Every structure is written in C-alpha cells, then in structure tokens.
C-alpha cells in the first residue's frame, strides 16, 4: 500500500510540474551545461556555461540529437559565414524541461508542456508575428535559424550542446511539438523539409505529375530524401543518377525504379543515352539536381525533354559557376527552371505527415542515419561527414 501511495504521489508531482512549467521529477536541471563551441576552423571544444534564466516567453530544451548538415560541414571546414566562435547544429530535437508562463502552444497552435519533444524552425526577428500561413518567400529569405547564430551572452544558440535556449517574444522563434515522432524521424525533419519544399516548388511548373518520368541526380542524403518524398506522393517512375553503387542501391529502396552509375560512361552523350534507356527510351519530364557540383548542373539539361522541368536545389553555398548553352539547353527546349532554397513554416507541417507516411509504407528513412556520435566526439563526427564515408551523420546525446 505504501509503495502504491509513493507511485501516485510521484505521478501527481510530474503532472503538476508539467502544468507549472518546471522540470518533471527525475529530470533535474543543472546550473551549468556544455556547448560544442567551434573556436577555429576544423576544431570544436566543449565549453561549460551557466544556463540562462528562462523568461516568461522562453523555453529550455534538453538536446536529444542533431543531424550534421552539409552547411555545418562547410562552416567547420572554411568558416564561409564568418561565424567563429559559434555553436552550430540546426537539425536538432529535444525535450522541453522548462518554459515560461506565457508559452502555451507551438507555432501551429498545438498545446505544449514540459516533457514534450520539439524542433525549431526559423527565427523571424524582423517579423515576429509571422505565422505558418504567411507564405511570402521574401519573409523566409531573411530568416535566421538556431545553429547559425552569432555567439552572444546566451551561448546556448545551437543544437550541438547539452541544452538549447529558445528565446520567445520579439526574437521571433518558431517551433513545433513533434512528440508523436521517434528520435530518428525528428532528427531528419529539417533535411526532409528542404525536399518537401523543393517538390512543392517543382509542382508550381505544372509538369510534375503522378505519371511523370523523373530524374534525381545525386544520391547523398538530399537526393535520397527527394526520391522518398516523390515516392510517397505517388511518383513511381524515378531514375536515380550517381557515381556510388551503394548509394544507388539505397535509392532503389527509397523508391527509385531505375538507376544509372555515371562512372560507367564516358562523355555526356553516352550518359544521356543511358538515362534515356533507363526510362524506356524517353527523356525525363522533370529533373531534380541535388548535388553541389557545377558540372552536374551543366549536364542535367541533356536528360530533360523539350518542355520539361528542372528544380535546382544542390547549391546551399557558392560552389562555383556552371556553364550552359542558353540556346540549346534552355530556350530551344523551353525548360521550366525553378530554384529551391530551404523551406517555409508550412513545409514543416507537411514534413511531419511525410515522415509518418514514409514509415507506414516501409521506406528505410532511419537507415539514412549511418553514424551516431556523442557530443564529446563532435570533431570526429564532422570529419566523418567531410570524408563522405556515410550518409547522414548525427550527434546523439546520452
């Protein structure tokens, strides 16, 4: 009887603590915690700081995991954004351990409480009242994200840390309650949103349909997720193009029905014929260019039929100039070209549904995460990403 009373008492304490915005029993918040601070190119060091005081509009999140993005790898290698010193990590997720009294719902209006799992999206400092129904792309273009913020007194500005501090009010943070998704799915939300947005951009051309012949060039994480998004939407005539046979095999598991290894062909003419043969003697109705290689962009026009479409989404940094012949590649073929850059708030909501659908039909999404490292091994994690020895690399806290 005494044991039952203790259990009931503990349950009541946890319920009450969730209502009052404090950490539940057994989840004591320390006074100090660690961040992985990038102090110079190709070097993180773990630094300990006092956790900030949580204000009425703020949220303190215990980090559970964070994917390593190509953007993180580029910043780690060359600091192209000039952010050093910086706490990186923007593909993160974790559990709310404390929140201000004014925090009641997430950006979609879904109730939140201590113990819920969340992800962050964009930061709209210039327009903190923006909602997920404001789809003007110019608003998104000027947004920030946690994990690419300049260092300041808060310190806990990125997901490569023990905790992350989500600032409320006029700071313009957006976040979503994703407690109904498992950890691997939550880590994949941000990169999947990039592809959900790219497919939505492609649909604006009016060319991408259920029976479209589609080429996806590049079978890294972005290209593989692109194939999965297309497959879940009912596009089942997909040709994957890459130079890595293992990645091409994975592409088939994600929904590609044919593959072409460009390493087996000399010259763009031979490669084009191979792509055409893989699609029953036809050029593609639509193509997605998912690499950051300028030569790949130059070549992909050859794979597309007259009047077809192309979505370029591979260049998240300046990868150099690509050379095309505007007459032969674009004008005379009347190619419909769209660029795609990150995502908007609505794309995040769509991404949650995509991940549930992908899991339901058996797509191996979680297998995209090939390497998991603790925070203490973050330098090794970034080096693994640069070496391209896996697909998706993630930092997963104990």
Feature map (PLM): residue ranges:
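Short N-terminal strand-loop motif that marks the start
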Residues: 3-93, 162-166, 170, 181, ...
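C-terminal hydrophobic helical "lid"/dimerization subdomain
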Residues: 21-31, 298-302, 345-398
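Glycine-rich beta-strand-centered segment in the early N-terminal region that forms part
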Residues: 50-66, 79-132, 157, 179
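NAD(P)H dinucleotide-binding glycine-rich loop of Rossmann-like/cofactor-binding domains
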Residues: 106, 125-214
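Adenosine-nucleotide cofactor-binding segment
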Residues: 216-219, 231-299
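N-terminal Rossmann-fold NAD(P) dinucleotide-binding loop
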Residues: 223-224
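C-terminal substrate-binding/catalytic core of Rossmann-like NAD(P)-dependent dehydrogenases/reductases
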Residues: 268-276, 280-281, 318-369, 380
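Helix-to-beta-strand junctions that scaffold the AdoMet/dcAdoMet cofactor pocket
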Residues: 304-306
């Amino acid at each position: 009887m005494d044991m039952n009373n203790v259990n009931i008492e503990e349950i009541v304490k946890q319920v009450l603590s969730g209502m009052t915005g404090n950490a539940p029993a057994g989840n004591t918040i320390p006074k100090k915690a660690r961040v992985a601070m990038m102090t110079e190119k190709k070097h993180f060091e773990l630094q300990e700081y006092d956790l900030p005081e949580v204000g009425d509009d703020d949220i303190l999140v215990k980090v559970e995991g964070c994917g390593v993005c190509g953007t993180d790898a580029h910043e780690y290698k060359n600091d192209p954004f000039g952010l050093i010193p910086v706490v990186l990590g923007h593909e993160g997720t974790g559990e709310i351990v404390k929140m201000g009294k004014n925090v009641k719902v997430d950006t979609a209006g879904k109730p939140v409480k201590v113990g819920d799992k969340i992800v962050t999206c964009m930061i709209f400092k210039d327009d903190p009242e923006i909602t997920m129904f404001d789809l003007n792309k110019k608003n998104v273009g000027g947004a920030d994200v946690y994990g690419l913020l300049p260092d300041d007194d808060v310190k806990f500005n990125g997901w490569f840390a023990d905790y992350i501090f989500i600032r409320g009010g006029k700071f313009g943070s957006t976040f979503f309650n994703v407690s109904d998704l498992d950890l691997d799915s939550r880590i994949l939300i941000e990169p999947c949103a990039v592809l959900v947005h790219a497919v939505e951009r492609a649909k604006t051309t009016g060319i991408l349909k259920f029976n479209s012949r589609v080429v996806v060039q590049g079978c890294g994480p972005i290209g593989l997720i692109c194939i999965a998004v297309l497959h879940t939407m009912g596009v089942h005539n997909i040709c994957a193009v890459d130079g890595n046979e293992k990645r091409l095999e994975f592409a088939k598991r994600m929904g590609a029905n044919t593959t072409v290894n460009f390493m087996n062909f000399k010259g763009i003419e031979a490669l084009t014929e191979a792509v055409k043969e893989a699609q029953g003697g036809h050029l593609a109705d639509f193509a997605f260019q998912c690499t950051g290689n300028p030569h790949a962009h130059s070549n992909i026009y050859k794979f597309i039929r007259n009047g077809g479409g192309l979505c370029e989404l591979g260049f998240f940094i300046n990868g150099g100039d690509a050379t095309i012949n505007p007459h032969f590649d674009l004008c005379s073929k009347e190619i419909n070209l769209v660029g795609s850059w990150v995502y908007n708030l609505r794309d995040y909501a769509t991404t949650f549904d995509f991940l549930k659908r992908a899991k339901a039909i058996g797509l191996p999404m979680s297998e995209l995460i090939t390497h998991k490292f603790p925070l203490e091994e973050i330098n090794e994690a970034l080096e693994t990403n640069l070496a391209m020895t896996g697909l998706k690399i993630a930092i997963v806290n104990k």
